[in-house]
């Protein structure tokens, strides 16, 4: 009973396995022969669907069972698929099948198994692809076909190793001796998809490098082709001309000359191309250097401008300090010129010079007074040399705004109330001018001829309307006249004084304060000034005298007895001349200071 049960179980197992294997074999054969076209992806899939070694081991195990059941049947040779592992499995399975019994149906089943294995062997052989087809399959993936070849196609000796000769210890040595066993597994272990991808990327980069190196070669080849085409055209034309003249003789020496010429032209063209490349590289480098050099030039220019501004500020500060020193000693003024006699012609020359040189008369008087004061041990100190500071960045900056020029009601240009250099000695008035010109000496000269006296004081300003500017007489005075030699000498002297003392150009007229005098002093000064003006009017003519007297009469009617102040017409004239001539005083002072600073540098 036990033998029958074992036989039934073995039959059921074999039938199930046969059904499964037949389904696999039919599907493989149908899919392989169904596709007529050669599709690479499909072939790769079919190669992967071949029977695996595990399947073959299972089939061999079944055959071993059949052999134990019916020992008359011989086993097929499966060593090409699995090799030595079958030996150890055979020893294990022999003990299990000793009690199995024989039956008449076992022959049919063994035949079915043998036929099935033969069909599988044929399918494997047909599935093997030729080497040329393998090359076409793996060209796109940059995989060498040698790595994909199936080494099982090589036929080895069919001598099967005997079980008794080899022990389990020698199995590893035996597997190592045969280099073509399980080669597919070894190759798959060595070349993974990641390693293949890295190899592919390396080959692509090498191709790019080669492409960059070959660009120049391609250009040279194109140039050579163009030259060859030109040579062919020349050969044709020369051959035709030579055949017409010489009757078709050989053209070899001329061809050699043409070839030599073309070779020389090619060499020259190569040299020109190399030269142009070198020139482009030099131009690029020079452009970069030029951009780098422009920045330090700009920095140097900015530094120079800052240095000049700092120098100008230092000079202005020093001049202002000198003005402060002169302002601290206003009491030193004295009537040093009272001992000298001054003709009325000097007054006219002074006004004319101030008009022609556009310098206020007060500045001229100050310069003359300072020069004489220096001769007699005057108050001006010796001019010190200007020390330029070493570090120009430490110099304090001063604001030097432009002067705002505007016109008064009568149309004359007037300077603003805040001049460029405000620190100037104050208190210089018309009485100082009269005293400096020596009007007290002129009084004795004109008392004999003209004994007229002014009944009103002269040093106060007019409260009412000022005298109208005389049109014809002043137009004649404003006209430019040729200066005599004395006047030119005086002008040169004034220019020299201005060069030495530029601070005298900026007298502040709007901050003048009258110095208090006694009544007797005022009357004496009034008489002196009146006599000086009479002499001046006599020099200019009787017509001018009439205009001055009429204007003085109009002024006298508008004044009160003792409280109201009077002023001569010439004082108003001098003030207007000063207003007219001081319009460019600040600009000239600046220009002169800049010139001196540049000379000292």
UniProtKB/Swiss-Prot annotation:
Subcellular location: Secreted
GO MF annotations, alphabetized: chemoattractant activity; cytokine activity
PANTHER family noted in UniProt: SECRETOGRANIN II (PTHR15119), SECRETOGRANIN-2 (PTHR15119:SF0)
Annotated GO biological process: angiogenesis; eosinophil chemotaxis
InterPro entries given in the database record: Granin (IPR001990), ScgII (IPR038858)
Pfam families xref list: Granin (PF01271)
Official protein name in the record: Secretogranin-2
Family: Belongs to the chromogranin/secretogranin protein family.
């Amino acid at each position: 009973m036990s033998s029958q049960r074992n036989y039934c179980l073995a039959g059921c197992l074999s039938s199930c396995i046969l059904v499964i294997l037949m389904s696999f074999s039919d599907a493989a054969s149908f899919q392989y022969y169904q596709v007529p076209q050669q599709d690479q992806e499909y072939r790769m899939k079919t190669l992967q669907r071949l029977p695996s070694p595990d399947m073959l081991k299972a089939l061999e195990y079944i055959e071993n069972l059949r052999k134990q059941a019916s020992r008359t049947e011989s086993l097929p040779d499966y060593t090409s698929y699995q090799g030595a592992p079958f030996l150890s499995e055979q020893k294990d399975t022999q003990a299990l099948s000793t009690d199995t019994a024989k039956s008449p149906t076992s022959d049919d089943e063994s035949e079915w198994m043998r036929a099935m294995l033969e069909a599988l062997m044929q399918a494997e052989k047909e599935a093997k692809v030729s080497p040329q087809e393998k090359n076409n399959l793996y060209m796109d993936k940059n995989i060498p076909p040698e790595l994909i070849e199936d080494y099982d196609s090589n036929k080895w000796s069919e001598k099967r190793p005997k079980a008794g000769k080899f022990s389990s210890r020698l199995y590893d040595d035996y597997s190592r001796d045969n280099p073509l066993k399980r080669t597919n597994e070894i190759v798959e272990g060595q070349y993974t998809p990641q390693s293949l991808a890295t190899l592919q990327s390396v080959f692509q980069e090498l191709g790019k490098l080669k492409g960059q190196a070959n660009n120049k070669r391609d250009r040279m080849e194109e140039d050579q082709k163009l030259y060859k085409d030109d040579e062919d055209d020349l050969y044709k034309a020369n051959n035709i001309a030579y055949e017409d003249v010489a009757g078709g003789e050989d053209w070899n020496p001329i061809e050699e000359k043409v070839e030599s010429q073309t070779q020389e032209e090619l060499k020259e063209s190569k040299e020109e191309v190399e030269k142009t490349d070198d020139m482009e590289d030099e131009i690029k480098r020079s452009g970069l250097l030029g951009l780098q050099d422009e920045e330090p030039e700009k920095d140097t220019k900015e530094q120079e401008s800052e240095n000049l501004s700092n120098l100008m500020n230092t000079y202005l500060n020093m001049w202002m300090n000198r003005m402060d020193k002169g302002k601290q000693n206003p009491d030193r003024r004295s009537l040093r010129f009272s001992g000298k006699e001054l003709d009325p012609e000097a007054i006219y020359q002074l006004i004319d010079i101030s008009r022609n040189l556009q310098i206020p008369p007060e500045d001229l008087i100050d310069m003359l007074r300072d020069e004489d004061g220096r001769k007699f041990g005057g108050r001006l100190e010796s001019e010190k040399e200007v020390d330029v500071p070493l570090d120009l960045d430490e110099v304090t900056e001063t604001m030097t705004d432009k002067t705002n020029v505007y016109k008064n009601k009568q149309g004359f240009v007037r300077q603003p109330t805040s001049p460029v250099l405000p620190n100037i000695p104050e208190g210089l008035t018309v009485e100082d001018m009269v005293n400096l010109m020596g009007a007290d000496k002129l009084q004795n000269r004109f008392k004999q001829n003209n004994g007229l006296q002014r009944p009103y004081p002269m040093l106060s300003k007019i409260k009412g309307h000022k005298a109208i500017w005389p049109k014809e007489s002043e137009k004649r005075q404003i006209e430019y006249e040729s200066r005599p030699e004395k006047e030119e000498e005086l002008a040169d002297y004034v220019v020299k004084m201005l060069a030495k003392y530029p601070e005298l150009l900026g007298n502040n007229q709007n901050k003048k304060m009258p110095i208090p005098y006694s009544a007797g002093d005022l009357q004496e000064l009034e008489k002196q000034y009146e006599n000086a003006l009479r002499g001046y009017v006599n020099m200019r003519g009787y017509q001018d005298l009439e205009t001055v007297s009429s204007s003085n009469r109009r002024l006298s009617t508008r004044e009160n007895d003792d409280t109201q102040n009077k002023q001569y017409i010439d004082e108003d004239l001098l003030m207007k001349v000063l207003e007219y001539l001081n319009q460019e005083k600040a600009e000239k002072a600046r220009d002169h200071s800049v010139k001196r600073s540049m000379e000292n540098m």
